[in-house]
């Protein structure tokens, strides 16, 4: 398991975000960031999590949309009779202390961005300034509080407990970048240096309510809220012949101001009932809501001129608003019958059902502010607000063109499975299962300025066997064998042909993209020299088709 600098999510066995899966208390959980499949693990501090399991061998009862690992996070419950804690911390980055730090307009102290759009094209009604403000002495800070209490209710003194966590974090980063692109024959057509000022603001709230009835029936509710805002100002100066193609060595300046304001709400209800000494029933439902927005992204390009810099013509001056709304419903139920064995009494047969129903709605509005007559600017001190205003729009210095892109994705997954665990003796433990999944995905799109309209569908039936075998060679050594079939579904952004423009890249989905079939084989040797030490050797093979 590894994590790459600058990338939110982890890599497992060389497989990145789309091949891994994250569950929260056993339920699938979406990412707080629409660009990713998995939620960032940075949100889960030791104050929040009880355990984290990384499962690289798969069974019938687990996630099917996985190829690298399933990361299961169990939220913390109250231990003991009561708990209360307050934490405050601070720090600083020397680069942000000594730099006039640039902040974009339109984001408040809590990281909540102003998403107001101007509406009509013949009026310049943008609320946010194009000119970032300068700040100094940027201090990183973190606040957190957690607490809980256990009560005993009823004549049987049944346990009722709650646990709450709330946290706020603000941090600043400054980086100097180099953007360089070449043609296929190695000719450099883009060579720019950049200064990037980034501020990250996040809040997290978690609540757990837990009730035990007569030590046989269990009911729990979990809530989690994650708000994550990343805002940045990037100034890039240098040569770009693909953009600034003129007589001044193709030199120019680009300012990109961007805020990504994302919310994730999680609600989970779970119950477990001991029906008899050998039969138990469990069920649960989870409803997740993701709201991801990129409000008022501002891109301005200035080309080198005789007396300074002028605004580039065409669609090079842009303001952009996008919002993705995702509703994610998960349900599950299972019946477990415990079998008799002469060992650890872990043998059982289980049948179950999992269902996941996801709806994604995406809309992006782009305002191109086409230049007709440009002022001359000096990079040392310039104001774009002095040019882009209602008076200059009325006088014909520039015009506004508005375009809306939309796509929707609907995903339904029905899973039914049966699996068995049996311990033959002190050495051999077998887990054998099979799952049937029905996957239906529909995408409808009207994107790229109306140039691409259409729809696409994916309908698949999957039969997914799994085998896990453990052999205890000695009390300190064990061999494990795992074999399974899983799949990897394309993400919503990957099956819509919407074109996203980044700082140094463009990305576009393909509506004809198909799921991957994954064949997994694992062999592992574990050696425990002492109860607190572990030595492992693992060999694995994966065949990923499509």
Regions found by a protein language model. Give the residues of each.
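Surface-exposed extracellular loop regions of Gram-negative outer-membrane beta-barrel proteins
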Residues: 27-28, 291-293, 359, 385-397, ...
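Outer-membrane beta-barrel signature, preferentially recognizing the C-terminal barrel domain
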Residues: 246-270, 401-414, 458, 487-544
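Membrane-embedded beta-barrel scaffold of Gram-negative outer-membrane proteins
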Residues: 280-286, 291-298, 348-350, 427, ...
């Amino acid at each position: 398991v590894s994590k790459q600098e600058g990338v939110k999510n982890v890599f497992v066995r060389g497989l990145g975000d789309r091949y891994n899966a994250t569950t929260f208390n056993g339920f699938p959980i979406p990412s707080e960031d629409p660009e990713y499949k998995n939620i960032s693990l940075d949100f889960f501090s030791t104050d929040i999590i009880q355990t984290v399991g990384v499962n690289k061998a798969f069974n019938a009862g687990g996630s099917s949309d996985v190829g690298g690992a399933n990361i299961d996070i169990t939220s913390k419950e109250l231990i003991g009779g009561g708990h209360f804690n307050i934490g405050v911390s601070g720090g600083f980055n020397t680069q942000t202390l000594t730099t006039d730090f640039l902040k974009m307009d339109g984001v408040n102290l809590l990281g909540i961005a102003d998403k107001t759009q101007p509406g009509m094209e013949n009026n310049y009604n943008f609320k946010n300034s194009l000119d970032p403000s300068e700040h100094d002495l940027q201090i990183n800070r973190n606040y957190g509080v957690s607490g809980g209490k256990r009560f005993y209710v009823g004549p049987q003194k049944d346990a009722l407990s709650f646990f709450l966590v709330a946290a706020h974090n603000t941090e600043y980063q400054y980086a100097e970048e180099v953007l360089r692109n070449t043609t296929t024959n190695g000719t450099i057509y883009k060579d720019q240096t950049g200064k990037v000022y980034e501020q990250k603001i996040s809040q997290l709230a978690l609540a757990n309510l837990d009730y035990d009835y007569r030590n046989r029936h269990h009911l729990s509710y979990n809530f989690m809220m994650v708000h994550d805002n990343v805002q940045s100002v990037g100034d890039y100066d240098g040569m770009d012949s693909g953009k600034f193609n003129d007589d001044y060595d193709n030199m120019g300046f680009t300012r990109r101001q961007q805020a990504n304001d994302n919310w994730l709400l999680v609600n989970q209800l779970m119950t477990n009932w001991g029906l008899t000494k050998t039969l138990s029933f469990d069920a649960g439902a989870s409803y997740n809501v993701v709201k991801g927005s990129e409000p008022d992204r501002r891109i301005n390009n200035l080309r080198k001129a005789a007396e300074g810099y002028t605004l580039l013509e065409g669609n090079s001056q842009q303001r952009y608003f996008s919002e993705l709304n995702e509703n994610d419903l998960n349900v599950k139920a299972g019946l477990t019958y415990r079998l008799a064995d002469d060992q650890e009494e872990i043998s059982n047969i289980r049948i179950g059902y999992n269902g996941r129903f996801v709806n994604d709605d995406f809309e992006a509005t782009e305002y191109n502010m086409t230049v007709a007559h440009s002022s001359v600017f000096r990079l040392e001190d310039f104001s774009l607000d002095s040019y882009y205003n209602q008076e200059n729009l009325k006088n014909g210095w520039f015009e506004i063109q508005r375009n809306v892109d939309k796509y929707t994705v609907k995903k339904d997954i029905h899973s039914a499975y049966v699996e068995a665990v049996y311990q033959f003796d002190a050495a051999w433990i077998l887990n054998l299962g099979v799952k049937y999944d029905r996957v239906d995905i529909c995408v409808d799109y009207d994107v790229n300025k109306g140039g691409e309209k259409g729809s696409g569908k994916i309908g698949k039936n999957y039969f997914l066997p799994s085998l896990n075998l453990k052999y205890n060679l000695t009390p300190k050594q064990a061999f494990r064998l795992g074999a399974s079939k899983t799949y990897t579904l394309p993400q919503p952004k990957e099956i819509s042909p919407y074109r996203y423009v980044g700082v140094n890249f463009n990305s576009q989905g393909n509506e004809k993209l198909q799921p991957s079939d994954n064949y997994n084989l694992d062999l592992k040797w574990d050696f425990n020299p002492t109860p607190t030490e572990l030595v492992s050797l693992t060999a694995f093979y994966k065949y990923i088709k499509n």
